[in-house]
Design a protein with these regions (language model features):
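Hydrophobic, aromatic-enriched interface-forming segments
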Residues: 114-187
Length: 284
């Protein structure tokens, strides 16, 4: 996304904005149009009132690019006019941004990011998609900035995969195997419904450890995977993922707790008391 915007706008600035189910950044209410500034809200799910405020203030200079089903449905339910931009749950924000800005196919670097964000586990998942994601997100000892020529030079992209991405992926797999012993089957109870999940309190914060564990224990029937991070002193940050073949909608469940996301993956927070109220262990 940054690379695409830098190609289009030489003087683009990037701001880290707190948003979503935790809080809305106060700076959003203080932004004022100046006749030449455009705002791109990319991969970000403001509450509808905040989006409406920015749309009214900036008009077509406010561009919203997003793919979170919870945010898109919340906006649709208002009946308000759609802001400028592009929104589609079938692609990642990186792919949508490229498509919005350029009349050209997305490069491999963007395509792999797209597949990772949508959890499309094809034949390239472990050799290309996941290793490239580790480079992009600067995990472990990755260089802080990779050479942006990877978007046009596929040989350079392959060099980054071999030198950084694939070794880091192997190391991460080792960490996941070490964490597998901490997997707990739990039941999440909500509005009279019970969902059987595999739970892990994990610093890696995604479902791959749980999915791999589940493949080794197919006799355990679960609806999805719950990855948690205890944030002292008073809350849990949680990511919910659907298991293959499951009929649950992660975004719907997350919305009931004030969160949101995608049908297959979503996030929310719980206080310690709500965590103990809604989530219980069950026997394997």
């Amino acid at each position: 996304v940054r690379h695409a915007l830098r190609q289009r706008y030489a003087d683009v600035q990037f701001e880290c904005i707190r948003h979503g189910y935790l809080c809305e950044d106060r700076r959003l209410q203080e932004l004022r149009p100046d006749g030449h500034t455009q705002i791109y809200a990319v991969d970000i799910s403001f509450c509808p009132e905040t989006t409406r405020h920015l749309q009214r203030a900036f008009g077509s200079d406010f561009v919203w690019i997003d793919h979170h089903i919870s945010a898109l449905e919340a906006w649709r339910d208002t009946g308000w006019e759609h802001p400028a931009g592009i929104r589609d749950t079938a692609h990642s924000a990186a792919w949508l941004t490229w498509h919005h800005l350029f009349d050209a196919p997305a490069p491999l670097a963007v395509t792999w990011a797209d597949k990772y964000d949508l959890w499309q586990q094809d034949a390239e998942w472990e050799t290309r998609t996941c290793p490239w994601q580790l480079v992009v997100t600067c995990r472990f000892s990755t260089p802080e900035r990779y050479d942006l020529r990877v978007f046009s030079d596929e040989r350079l992209l392959e060099t980054y995969l071999r030198r950084y991405g694939q070794p880091m992926f192997a190391y991460e797999q080792h960490l996941r195997r070490r964490e597998a012993g901490a997997v707990q089957p739990v039941v999440l109870s909500l509005d009279g419904h019970s969902y059987r999940l595999l739970f892990l309190n994990s610093s890696l914060r995604d479902s791959q450890t749980l999915a791999a564990w589940h493949r080794r224990h197919p006799e355990i029937n679960v609806d999805g995977y719950l990855v948690g991070q205890h944030v002292p002193p008073l809350r849990w940050k949680l990511s919910l993922y659907t298991a293959n073949g499951s009929g649950i909608n992660a975004a719907r469940i997350a919305q009931r707790f004030g969160g949101g996301g995608h049908a297959s993956a979503a996030g929310f927070t719980l206080s310690l008391s709500d965590f103990e109220k809604h989530i219980k262990t069950f026997q394997k």
